[in-house]
Amino acid sequence: SGLFCAVKVITNIADAFQTVEVNLNKWKPVIPNKKFDVNIRWPEDIQAEQRIFDEKLPAVQEFLKHNKFNEVTHDATNKELGIIAVGKSYVDTLTTLQKHNIVPEKHGISILKIGMSWPLQGSLIEKFCSDHEDILIIEEKGSLVEDQIYKLLYGYSYAPRIYGKNLLSRCL
């Protein structure tokens, strides 16, 4: 898409080391067939914002739709709780459930793994949330994903109850 990008590295990853062999033959990303200028200009011209919103962000959404950065990994049939877990929090969530012998699907828990946290894949979030009455968002310190979900679902008749950074204050 030609957008600026960043990678968030948490302490557990930054303070660890491991040699990893990457096999690029295993992951073949689907690249949308969009024709526009992906080059970054410096200094950027006045039409930059228009290109971002009209061309580049839609290209990112198209890329997300065809590649599994964000996906439902556990899909309960009796959907009581939807958990949206972001990045390393996804692994921590699965570890915690396993430690307490909780099989998500047997307990009515569906889990959506978020690997790319901005911009969120709106259609996937809306579909996942429409199937649940309660959503628990688990992410690191900031509320980047939680805030996006509030904005995505604002005004929808099916909007579930959302618990995230505000969970503790609701319990007290």
Where are these regions (language model features)?
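Flexible, low-complexity linker and terminal segments
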Residues: 1-172
